[in-house]
Amino acid sequence: MKNTVLAAFSGILLATTAVVYAGDKGQEIYDSKCKVCHETGAAGAPKMGDKDAWAPRIAAGTDSLMNSVINGKNAMPPKGTCMDCSDDDLKAAMEYMTSKSQ
């Protein structure tokens, strides 16, 4: 019984740590790469936190957003200049931004 409880607790702890890490990674990438445009709306970028600007993008779905992030869109270059970011890194940044814009 103790082993079962310990295993369950360990699993929950690991899952929680992974979620926190993903959020931190998303914010880290946003702060270092995305913020320069998405905080001010430079070059037509939707400002983070602008629910009206983000609503149609969020409604289009994660695949559509990731396509824009990876390939670029309008004035946004591919990967938003984060050429060393993996797709998972970019997804973490996108999720961070959309979570603050709903």
What are the residue ranges of the model-derived segments?
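Gly/Gly-Pro-rich "capping" loops immediately C-terminal to redox-active cysteine motifs
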Residues: 39-67
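Processing junctions and N-termini across compartments
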Residues: 16, 28-31, 79
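Bacterial N-terminal signal peptides that target proteins for export
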Residues: 1-8
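Local sequence-structure signature of Cys/Sec-based thiol-disulfide redox active-site neighborhoods
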Residues: 23-33, 43
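Axial heme c-ligation environment in periplasmic c-type cytochrome domains
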Residues: 46-47, 55, 67-92, 96-101
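The canonical Cys-X-X-Cys-His
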Residues: 33-40, 93, 97
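Bacterial N-terminal signal peptides
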Residues: 8-16
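Sec/Tat signal peptide C-region and signal peptidase I cleavage site
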Residues: 17-23
